[in-house]
Design a protein with these regions (language model features):
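Structural/interface elements that position substrates and couple domains in central-metabolism enzymes
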Residues: 1-155
Length: 155
């Protein structure tokens, strides 16, 4: 948008799109909280598994990933957060976020021990049938699961 401004082009639409993107992590966490409420669980002290922390599917680039903001908000709400990402094995402290996590295996135990899973990045390597079978609650930000399932909430 800075280049468009340089030439006097109105960038309001670009700026609005950026604002919407920046507010998505809060929207996802709000939907997670509401879904947990329906299941008579609270966000506070829940166990949440984040699926995918890369910026886009099938890459290891985490720059601008919404997962970091989601994790940060969850941490502030006393949530026990874990993540699984086949492309990002470790989260390191950065200038913006103080997150130190190692990726966990995507398996029956980790899925069933979580109060909810939040699909942030839809990597092809994820076993979506396994996720569907063993997750108690799924917050689907990518439209990978049927919304007809009672445990799936689109965000």
């Amino acid at each position: 948008s800075w280049k468009a401004k340089e030439y006097g082009v109105n960038t309001r639409f670009i700026e609005l799109a950026g604002q919407i993107n920046e507010s998505m992590p809060e929207f996802v966490v709000k939907n997670l909280k509401n879904a947990l409420d329906i299941k008579n669980k609270t966000l506070n002290k829940s166990k949440i598994l984040i699926l995918g922390v890369a910026y886009k599917k099938n890459v290891d680039d985490t720059r601008e990933s919404p997962a970091f903001k989601i994790i940060e908000i969850l941490k502030k709400n006393n949530v026990q957060v874990t993540y699984s990402d086949p492309h990002v094995k470790r989260l390191q402290k950065s200038r913006k976020y103080n997150l130190k996590y190692n990726s966990v295996k995507l398996n029956k135990k980790n899925l069933s021990n979580s109060d909810a899973v939040v699909l942030v990045t839809d990597h092809d390597e994820f076993d979506y049938k396994l996720i569907e079978k063993y997750s108690r609650l799924i917050i689907d930000t990518r439209g990978k699961f049927s919304s007809k399932m009672k445990k799936v909430y689109r965000s």
